[in-house]
Amino acid sequence: MEIIRTVAEMRAWRKQAGKLAFVPTMGNLHEGHLKLVAAARERAEKVVVSIFVNRLQFGQGEDFDAYPRTFDADCAKLAAAGVDALFFPSERELYPRVRQDFNVEPPHIQNELCGAFRPGHFRGVATVVTKLFNIVQPDLACFGKKDYQQLHVIQAMIADLNSPIEIVPVDTGRAGDGLALSSRNGYLSAEERAEAPRLYRNLSMIRDGLMAGSQDYAALEQAARDDLAAAGWTVDYVEVRQADTLEIAHAGEKRLVVLAAARLGKTRLIDNIEVFR
């Protein structure tokens, strides 16, 4: 596996890569990331993964400085997974002018759901992904459904800007007890880790209610919020939305997604379940 640190080297490598799949990450890799790599390997001749902890998508009081940097372990995992190249730019390499005057501004959905609690987050995501796409120039890129709102923003950006890159959604990787795999799971204490699957159980409860024909989304959402709060969670949101647009869902709609974000101790967990009736 080649390790590429500059934009010039990445562009030179890309010229001889053939059909190229790309997996952008912030490092601290786990089995969920490797699931994205496996999906990429199935679809292209070469796979490049990037590791870049993007300051622009962290808000005030968030964990940019504390975010785990595990470069050596990440390299070993990627090499074992058959990745052809790792793009590992410095902050100065990716943001050469230091200040970033031009940004990619997502639509109104960036201010809802996670965006309501993390102002500017999706602007930072859309901007860095655009920069990485321009540098790597992949044929396709794999994104996990666990970050459902992020996936929607990237898909909308690609469609609206007429980008030729194919976006491949990959199902959420889960632990045996249902907890969605996430780098932030490492922040959980042993007691919190035992409690964490409650989030997925509540999403599953809402899914079961929807599949049974319930149209009272508000009641299902409130029951989940109440259960989480009673167990000591701080709930940001639990919402049923349209799966394809993330707009507010109305009674009778067939393609839904249930999304939630809540804090367990100091750790913010997100998850979702698609419901196609």
UniProtKB/Swiss-Prot annotation:
Cellular compartment(s): Cytoplasm
One cellular component term from this protein's GO annotations in UniProt: cytosol
Quote the record's binding site residues for ATP.
26-33, 144-147, 173, 181-184
Q: Please name the SUPFAM superfamilies in this protein's record.
A: Nucleotidylyl transferase
Q: What EC number(s) is this enzyme filed under?
A: 6.3.2.1
GO BP annotation list: pantothenate biosynthetic process
Residue sites binding beta-alanine per the record = Q57
Which GO molecular function annotations are given, in alphabetical order?
ATP binding; pantoate-beta-alanine ligase activity
Q: Does the keyword S-adenosyl-L-methionine apply?
A: no
Q: Which residues form the active site?
A: H33
* Family note: Belongs to the pantothenate synthetase family.
Q: How does it assemble?
A: Homodimer.
Q: Which NCBIfam families does this entry report, sorted A to Z?
A: cyt_tran_rel, panC
Q: Write out the function statement from the record.
A: Catalyzes the condensation of pantoate with beta-alanine in an ATP-dependent reaction via a pantoyl-adenylate intermediate.
Q: What protein name applies here?
A: Pantothenate synthetase
Q: What taxonomic lineage is listed for the species of origin?
A: Bacteria, Pseudomonadati, Pseudomonadota, Betaproteobacteria, Neisseriales
